[in-house]
A protein has these predicted regions:
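Active-site-adjacent "subsite" loops/lids of carbohydrate-active enzymes
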Residues: 25-30, 39, 121-185
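The substrate-binding groove and active-site-proximal loops of carbohydrate-active enzymes
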Residues: 31-39, 79-96, 158-173, 239-249, ...
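Aromatic-lined carbohydrate-binding/catalytic grooves of carbohydrate-active enzymes
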Residues: 57-94
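Aromatic-lined carbohydrate-recognition surfaces of secreted/lumenal glycan-active proteins
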Residues: 113-121, 191-199, 236-285, 329-340
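Substrate-binding cleft of secreted/luminal carbohydrate-active enzymes
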Residues: 297-314, 318-321, 327-384
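Substrate-binding cleft/loops of secretory-pathway carbohydrate-active enzymes
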Residues: 122-126, 200, 264-310, 346, ...
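Aromatic- and acidic-residue-enriched segments that line the glycan-binding/catalytic groove
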Residues: 72-84, 122-155, 195-233
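Catalytic domains of carbohydrate-active enzymes, especially glycoside hydrolases
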Residues: 45-70, 185-189, 297-300
Length: 384
């Protein structure tokens, strides 16, 4: 009898150990974000991939689209000026090399998974307009952008974006073409960021409306009252119906991109950054991330859990919203590396104890300086 109970315990042990989350057959995801500001040359790209691989990261979110411009030869968007510095007039200038192709080649050589990382809805940033000859969205398709409740097109600020309207069918078609282009590269997945409504525009709107009252700032921060959306909803629809419409519009873009990308790469990983607070994401940014997971539009959900004080609480709420099974298979926790190494290591351990699929660190520049590991970077990677 005792022997039978012993063998029963052995059989049940894996279930007990992994009841909290990640199954034993799914290795930990250790991802890192590399932003478009981290590289300007082929040497930068090769150094980044080698550093990340040798540091033990399994996945790299490598940014190749920031605000309606591309860091690869695209048929639908002009080259990004950032490869040349800060001169907006360089928009559309071919740098003579393909950062995404180079990153993909180095990633394959060093056996690390590379994900094309795109800002989905940002269409332009900054006060200077791109040259008209470049055909950038801000000048070529002004009607594709969100419109505030006063009827004004959303204005970018010095460091903030103007967002494309996810309800516009031509916007969805355009973004789908980008996903199709990216699926032709030898990469592991597609990573989505800024796939939401700009719920926080009130924080920056005063830069473009310096003399506006608080009430006027609020009016300039509610989106989108464009002709397409008004045609579908009208102005008399309730807030609840408007919110549902906005949420559905964002979810449709996620589903579109997933469908297009996986039509060419069935085994690819579709991941998305989302707000760390599930309720804020759902009610204010209109991210129905639980639906994305349930319907299979995303394989990994990456909440940007960047507030150290609220880290544990927000992780707990996200885990509760998704459920145990989705947490272990889908939840990759985003961790901000701007703080000290001890706190970063603590958050990694909290994520592990919660049974998450893994974690993603933001960002490369916090762990490497001039492509050399910082003291903080060396301390952080010692925990795996």
């Amino acid at each position: 009898m005792k022997m039978r109970n012993f063998f029963l315990l052995i059989l049940l042990l894996p279930i007990v150990l992994f009841a909290g989350g990640r199954p034993p057959d799914r290795p930990e995801v250790r991802a890192i974000w590399v932003t478009r500001f981290d590289y300007k040359s082929p040497t930068d790209v090769s150094s980044i991939i080698v550093n990340c691989a040798q540091a033990g990261f399994t996945d790299i979110f490598f940014q190749i689209r920031g605000n309606g411009t591309a860091f690869y030869p695209s048929r639908v968007e002009p080259w990004a000026f950032e490869l040349f510095g800060k001169d907006v007039s360089k928009t559309g200038t071919n740098p003579g090399w393909d950062p995404l192709q180079m990153a993909a080649s180095w990633a394959k050589r060093y056996h690390v998974r590379l994900h094309a990382y795109i800002n989905v809805l940002p269409g332009w940033r900054g006060f200077d307009s791109p040259p008209r000859a470049a055909g950038q969205l801000w000048t070529a398709h002004p009607d594709w952008f969100m419109v505030d409740s006063t009827g004004a097109r959303m204005k970018p600020t010095s460091a903030w974006y103007s967002f494309l309207n996810p309800a516009h069918p031509q916007v969805r078609s355009h973004l789908s073409q980008i996903a199709d282009e990216l699926a032709r590269y030898d990469i592991a997945g597609l990573h989505l960021d800024y796939i939401r409504f700009p719920y926080d525009y009130t924080d920056v709107a005063r830069e473009v409306y310096p003399n506006a009252s608080s009430k006027e700032i609020k009016a300039h921060s509610v989106f989108s009252f464009d002709p397409v959306s008004l045609g579908a909803m009208g102005r008399s629809a309730s807030r609840r119906k408007w919110d549902a419409f906005r949420r559905k519009s964002v979810s449709q873009v996620v589903a579109d991109l997933c469908g297009i990308f996986k039509a060419r790469k069935a085994n690819a990983v579709l991941s998305s950054s989302v707000l760390a607070d599930f309720s804020t994401g759902y009610h204010e940014a209109f991210q129905d991330s639980r639906r994305w997971v349930k319907e299979g539009s995303v394989d990994w959900l990456v909440p940007m859990n960047y507030n150290a004080r609220l880290f544990d609480e927000r992780l707990g709420k996200m885990k509760h919203a998704l459920g145990r099974r989705a947490t272990g298979g889908k939840l990759v926790v985003g961790i901000n590396c701007a703080g000290d190494a001890r706190e970063i290591r603590r958050q990694i351990e909290v994520s592990r104890r919660a049974g998450c699929r893994g974690f993603a660190l933001f960002a490369y520049s916090h762990l490497f300086e001039n492509h050399q590991p910082t003291v903080k970077g060396e301390e952080v990677i010692r925990c795996w």
